[in-house]
Amino acid sequence: MLSCLSKPALRCRSVNRLQFLRKLSLQEIQTLKTQHQYLGRTRLDVETPSLKPSAAGSGSTAPKPVTEREIASTRFMPRKNVIKLTPLAVEHLKKMQSSASMKGKMLRIGVKQKGCAGQAYSLEYIEKPDKFDEIVKQDGISIIVARRALLQIIGSVMDYRDDDLQSRFIFSNPNVKSTCGCGESFSTLK
């Protein structure tokens, strides 16, 4: 494999470098461009010939060059949401946010010291998130997770239940170590 560091002509910026690059095959030029982009260097100053198949009908074409945009898109991988919402929870949140008194407000999920087991979920509507709060967007709904609750809530699933006695949000949290008898409070793994 051709390495750009093994060729002395590529280390200097001179006319000799351009002459050397013009003598390279198309495959070698594409390899050099890929190496330079991968290593974070600027692209090479050489024009790549068109990649049309020859008229002789050889049928082989050079590989497609990797663009700077493709390299940049692999540097940052999308993150998973801190909390997932079930379709019932999304539907109920949309109904709540469509009411006149809740326009422009978002639900903020937090954890506070309360109950037999030590911690309980707190839900409140706010207009503006705090500086380090996490905003979760799913199915057209935006909710906020308080920064102090991120470690306790991460990986949870939020559901909505409406039965004969009560209607409430239910959290399925993989970080819970134990819950109290009534189910209102919990303790997490440390």
From Swiss-Prot:
Q: Which gene encodes it?
A: isa1
Q: Where does Fe cation bind?
A: C116, C180, C182
The family this protein is said to belong to: Belongs to the HesB/IscA family.
Q: What is this protein called?
A: Iron-sulfur assembly protein 1
Gene3D superfamilies this protein is in? HesB-like domain
Q: Which PROSITE patterns match?
A: HESB
Q: Name a biological process GO annotation.
A: [4Fe-4S] cluster assembly
What cystine linkages occur within this chain?
none
